[in-house]
Amino acid sequence: MADSSSSLHPLCERISHKSYVLRAVDLTILGLLYSLLLYRILHISENDNVWLLAFFCESCFSLVWLIFTCLKWSPAEDIPYINTLNERVHDLPSLDMFVPTADTVRESPIITVNTVLSLLAVNYPANKLACYVSDDGCSPLTYFSLKEASKFVKIWAPFCKKYNVRVRAPFRYFLNPLVATDDSVFSKDWKMMKREYVKLCRKVEDATGDSHWLDADDDFEAFSNTKPNDHSTIVKVVWENKGGVGDEKEVPHLVYISREKRPNYLHHYKTGAMNFLLRVSGLMTNAPYTLNVDCDMYANEPDVVRQAMCVFLQNSKNSNHCAFVQFPQKFYDSYTNELAVLQSILGRGVAGIQGPFYIGTGCFHTRRVMYGLSSDDLEDNGNISQVATREFLAEDSLVRKYGNSKELVKSVVDALQRKSNPQKSLANLIEAAQEVGHCHYEYQTSWGNLGWMYDSVAEDINTSVGIHLRGWTSSFISPDPPAFIGSTPTLGLEAIVQQRRWATGAIEVLFNKQSPFMGMFHGKIKFRQRLAYFWALMCLRSIPELIYCLLPAYCLLHDSALFPKGPCLCTIVTLVGMHCLYSLWQFMSLGFSVQSWYVVQSLWRIIATSSWLFSIQDIILKLLGISQIGFVIAKKTIPETKSVYESKPSQGEDDVPKLNLGKFEFDSSGLFIPGTFIMLVNLAALAGYLVRLQRSSCSHGGGGSGLAEACGCILVVMLFLPFLKGLFEHGKYSIPLSTLSKAAFLTVLFVFFCVGK
């Protein structure tokens, strides 16, 4: 409850980041793009079909920049004031935390354990928290790991709170050696904690290779004769906070769940697991707010829950319409600098409109909104209107929407009416929780239209569109240090496959019933917010990106002109130079190096001509009914923690492990053929150009192709440098012969086509 007599200082404040200088730069680049288009239109009759292709590509790039400029026009973010929250709010609301995992091979249990430990140790009343771990692979190893983690957290959570530890994921905290200190008690506790964590890691590692413990413990009987895609519902209360005394009261509820899966039933991948988490948590604790994080995304800021509550508890009409609070994804490894920059720019941009997208992790949701409420269903005081009461709370409507579980229906009514459930023993609710996990439970209900949305492998964007279409807003908080930090796949197939899934899911959203296109005719989504979701269509840029990467080579081989001659060439030079300097400044302003900027520019081109290109193929095959789109789990890893007796060079607490920046891993997947083909074509064109220069240093030939086109080829080769390096590397960093031979065959065909014309 808030103290009305306290200061009127807000719990959070929306800060605008408008910059007239950046607006001027954006508009200047846009003006240069359209001046180039105008030049091509005026001179199109003097040139061949190459100019038509160039005009098409540059029109697409201009449209993308126009939309991006609109989205960046009024950037903003919410700044929470935790001290004000601590002063004014004495009875904090409850929170249910969701951690989904699905594959113990690609998502190691110790990764999930670290995420869970970081959540259980946040600075928030333990009796107000509950952590639910969904295991879609029904692995006894995951359950075993959580049982061991529940023992460790009883000493870990008190240790973190006693010494105000900031990074509460043990693997990350213990990467650094013990700093010399005069506090002998802390040193003793630190060494003891690290020993216990190393023991925990060894137990999980030993259990991975030896399953004898499965037969020795009756608690694992439910896992006998189970398969990842064929098993019954399992709900296990790993730890229940019953108050108690001492350190035990510092540990929130911890529940393991695995929904029923059968081969002949749709299970909707991660989206179905999230809806099961929503139902089970509604039955057991029914907190008004939920948090979901991926199993590798640990809480890096112990006050993150309080930061989100500053937005939800802000006493204003506008905050009553905030459906979710989204924190940006930040990573400690690999190639994801481009995500950090994109989220910083696009996240703040849409925060100034209707709010950021839900990005699938690091997000706090309002339970009532996930149950299907629209913003118009609420009165100014936050209560449900009479019209909405008749619509939502009628008995037949409740069963039709939420299923035939009486216990769940009652919990839904309580959540919609903002009633707190009386505390019950979690063990007494296991049977009801198992019921809502049956694979047929959602049949002929509204699940998938409420909760997390189905019909797309990108459940985050799909759900986000549905929420904004109902008139809700969302909040963007980007604290320093980051609230959540995770790992990503290494550069190569894992990264490209992940980007392919994201791109495919984004395009799916634009063709299903939650499409922002439909929001033009119904729904309460703002125009610029629709443009933000149309940004998902940038995946379609793969076609003009591919064409534009080949055009300079085509012109050199065909002896024709791609770029204007004389003074008009300055437009393109200015445009390219200005865009490069602008993007470089954006990277460096966020603390990234020039090398990181170059790697990201290269990666964008590789993703555009591989992941995005194949995502279009996936969508076409789905629309034709030829194949369905699967959900591919990216493999995640964390650095190994050494024992307390092993030494390591000292590094600051904020240091993070760095992978080989820009080092690309290849295999025989067809995803690498386009990039290899582009690189070989441009090398062939440059070789032909050099031969022609030797033969005639004074003439470029009839069409006038020359230095500008050669510079274009050099730029493309620089952007696809990982593929050039792959020709000379060994092992996993080398392009396989099968991929190279296919790309070489396509290159020969392309060269003959150009020369023949």
From Swiss-Prot:
The keyword Transmembrane helix applies. Expressed in young seedlings, primarily in the vascular tissue. Expressed in the root cap. It is an enzyme of class 2 (transferase). It is found in: Golgi apparatus membrane. It comes from the Eukaryota. The active site is at 136, 460. It holds the Pfam family Cellulose_synt. The chain crosses the membrane at residues 24-44, 50-70, 531-551, 572-592, 613-633, 671-691, 704-724, 735-755. InterPro entries: Cellulose_synth, Nucleotide-diphossugar_trans. This is Cellulose synthase-like protein B5.
